[in-house]
């Protein structure tokens, strides 16, 4: 996930950008600011750029999409829903072997608003502007992220097409590309696993 995203956005092998591992919660790691991204190159020649969806290229300010050349960004910084990474979720078999006791100590905060357990599920920002949390860290908010990313993507396309401005937009959904039939019986414990089957 992280390595292929880094390769697509930089045009370089992930090992060269240092993004060769799958990023996990609150690592205080991410793509370095000096990496040249597709968005930066396109911005230099007059394109409007946007990123909406799963970013998964780090949880440090310099790695955020709007700090990597995108004019606007609406993104999740991690892999899937963070609220599953808890002891309670592990006891319910929603996650295996990952809970907050395994995470590094980290004084990380996104802006002047502290959030539950120090991490942010969904953020938004504009080039040169502040990063802000969108919604809360609940499952309900997470389930709204893909429709919101789609809405923003369509609005970005319409706005730039109307202005006659060239644009590049990346929309990377957090969930699988289809929702399984609700009438289908499955042994998978989650909708994500159903989609992957």
Question: Where are the model-predicted features located?
Answer:
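Formylglycine-dependent sulfatase
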Residues: 1-197
